[in-house]
From Swiss-Prot:
This is Holo-[acyl-carrier-protein] synthase. It comes from Mycoplasma genitalium (strain ATCC 33530 / DSM 19775 / NCTC 10195 / G37). GO terms for cellular component: cytoplasm. It catalyses: apo-[ACP] + CoA = holo-[ACP] + adenosine 3',5'-bisphosphate + H(+). Its cofactor is Mg(2+). GO terms for molecular function: holo-[acyl-carrier-protein] synthase activity; magnesium ion binding. Its EC number is 2.7.8.7. It is found in: Cytoplasm.
Length: 114
């Protein structure tokens, strides 16, 4: 059963500005594992990484707003070239991300298991 759908779209240049000015946003958004990956990237890669993680976490939040998940508890990772996020046991999250030169969009479909 579908319990929620969330979508988010952002401009990449916003995230390049964030990356060039401070690490505060990354520390508030990312889990410790995500931060470890983030620190290994150059500024352009960091901007893309943040944009993808922000849009996915926003889409997840919108799809599961009745639960009010914390962004730092949502860990995004890639498996078989698809983004994944372990949430809570009885909810399955289906995620999709799309890119253009200027924008990143993400959608989340949250389904109740069982």
């Amino acid at each position: 059963m579908v319990v929620g759908i969330g979508i988010d779209v952002v401009q990449l240049k916003r995230f390049l500005t964030l990356v060039e000015t401070s690490d505060c946003f990354a520390k508030r958004l990312l889990t410790s594992n995500e931060l470890n990956s983030y620190w290994k990237l150059n500024n352009n890669q960091r901007a893309n990484f943040l944009a993808v993680h922000w849009t996915l976490k926003e889409a997840i939040y919108k799809a599961t707003s009745h639960i009010k998940p914390l962004f730092t508890k949502l860990e995004i990772y890639k498996l078989n070239n698809q983004y994944r996020c372990e949430f809570i046991q009885n909810i399955n999250l289906l995620l999709s991300v799309s890119y253009t030169n200027c924008h990143v969009s993400a959608i989340c479909l949250a389904q109740q298991n069982g």
